[in-house]
Amino acid sequence: MAAITYWLGLQGFARRHHNIPFRRRIRDEQAPEYEGLSHRLKQLMQGQHLYRNPNLNLISLSAELGIPPYQLTQLLNDHFQQNFNDFVNTYRVEEAIRLSRDPAYAHLSLLGIAFEAGFNSKATFNRAVKKVTGKTPRELR
């Protein structure tokens, strides 16, 4: 028993730099299903403006789609190449840009527009705008 443990330890040490892929990718037979899901997800985000809900989270969005959270995470990572927060914040930044150019929202400060777009804090808004556009929020107005 000790010899097996010793041998396994040596094998592990010898292969410590080998990358072992552990993440499942969307298989070819799943691709049509994921195309449909991505279309439904875009419709929900654009049509119902779910991103404007500051309490939107992975669980509530996956429930809205009728899929388990892990499947939504896989869809976002593989199809959109984004994590959940980046995906939602991209919609929020686009909404904030649209609102900042709308005369009906001219009376709001940038922070007010951020809250209208679904952001919870100024810091998150600033960080997301910089990440999505490469500009600061003030440069957007």
Regions found by a protein language model. Name each.
Residues 1-11:
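Alpha-helical membrane-embedded segments
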